[in-house]
Amino acid sequence: LVRSRGLGDVYKRQLPVCVLLYLLAYIDKSNISQAMLDGKNLPNGKVEDPGILTSLNMTPHEFSIALTVLFPTYMAFQLPSNLIIRKIGPRIWIPTLALTWGVVETLQGLVTSKAGLYINRIFLGLAEAGLTPGITLLLTFFYVPKELQFRQAFYFTGASLSGSFSGLLATALRKMDGISGQHGWQWVFYIEGIFTVAVAIVCYFIIPNGPRGCFMLSPLERELIMERQHAPTYRYQDLPHLALKLKEVKFEPTSENEGQLLTPPWYKEVLRTFIDERVYLTGILGF
């Protein structure tokens, strides 16, 4: 009962934060599409609320490049990000990622050329790359594998939520066209980026490194959840292709690792990842 109450507190308080971060990441990644189009044409031949294409003198092809350049760094930095998070913990790393992409998103409103937009999008991909694997890692500190599926599906709803109202939000923000001499599309980036920065600052105080440092849990709940995490949940013979030796895994509940499983050196983990066929199957489905 105590353990269930503790997991319920995590579910009610931590998962909504994960959903919000994922929602903001998705909005900040995709709101450039809302900034593309011009407003209505005026009788004098000018355009009311010009879009980013007109403001930066970009062609549709150049704009498609701006959409694409985000993904190379987005894909490449996911693995390094999760190696970093193991060293410094989710409490610092996840809010830092959100703070970084929030700043980059805000600065996107200041770009004055297509080259500047390309560079901004590259750094946006770099900053957002670690969020999904980072949140997934954080959830593994609280839930056993059979419980993760629903929790992951829950925070992935952030993408669906963003699609339901991000367009309406961008349309409303673009009505600020002309205020302080800024175009409407610039205000979209300013407001949404600043809001992400504000949420990131709050997250420094509410995202834990694991059960041991989770403020919403009592000492007994923390110990029960940690004990539950490291109870056997599958047999070694169920995972022969991973070539994981049980003797290489140990449990050391210290203040540094928050009671996480200490696995073999990171390069062995990386090697096992690259030879796991499920990684490639999942990647194909995602593509």
Residue ranges and their predicted role:
Residues 33-75:
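Extracellular/periplasmic helix-loop-helix junction of adjacent transmembrane segments
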Residues 1-7, 11:
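Single conserved hydrophobic/aromatic residue that forms the stacking wall/gate
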Residues 8, 145-159, 174, 178-272:
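Central mid-sequence intracellular linker of multi-pass
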Residues 104, 116-130, 138:
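Hydrophobic core of transmembrane alpha-helices in multi-pass small-molecule transporters
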Residues 71-79, 129, 164:
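Residue-level signature of mid-helix packing/kink "hotspots" within the transmembrane helices
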Residues 28, 57, 88-89, 110-115, ...:
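Helix-breaking motifs and short loop linkers at transmembrane-helix boundaries and internal kinks
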Residues 51, 82-83, 172:
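Membrane-interface helix termini in secondary transporters
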Residues 76-115:
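Conserved MFS/SLC helix-loop-helix module at the cytosolic interface between two early adjacent transmembrane helices
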